[in-house]
Amino acid sequence: FDENIFLYLENDDLCKRIIDNDENIYIVPRSKIKHLGAKAVDEKYEYEIELSRNWHWVWSKFYYNKKHYGLINAYIKVCPIFISATLKMLLYFFINKRKKEIYLFRMLGFLNAAIGRKSFYRPKINY
């Protein structure tokens, strides 16, 4: 696994590298996996997890595309998400604080990836 990827696209990255090395990926059609999504974390942290998801989704998307297809392709693929997040953040600025912050975190994930910062953001959870 690429240790730079904290969350999102780690499976895509692994499969891409396997294919690029002319190795095989096996599919088990009858296999089933139930993904519970953040069930290991107390529900009181749900919003913090949502912020983290949005930050890492955009960061990982930019990083993955830059790594495998180059910087220009990363901008082409991820700039529309950044522009959309910016517009939505402005739309929700005065009417919905939570949605405003979610789109702000998408923007921050993009900006940090674009300037080459590592995937540093972690949810603020106290056990």
Question: Model-predicted segments: where are they?
Answer:
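Membrane-interface aromatic/basic loop that binds lipid-linked glycans or pyrophosphate carriers
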Residues: 99-127
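Active-site-adjacent helix/loop segment of glycosyltransferases
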Residues: 16, 20, 24-97, 101
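Generic secretory/membrane-interface signal
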Residues: 5, 29, 55, 115-118
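Acidic donor-binding loop at a coil-to-helix junction in glycosyltransferase catalytic cores
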Residues: 4-16, 53
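Generic hydrophobic/packing signal
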Residues: 11, 22-23, 31, 105-106, ...
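Short linear sequence elements within intrinsically disordered, low-complexity coil regions
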Residues: 6, 13, 69, 74, ...
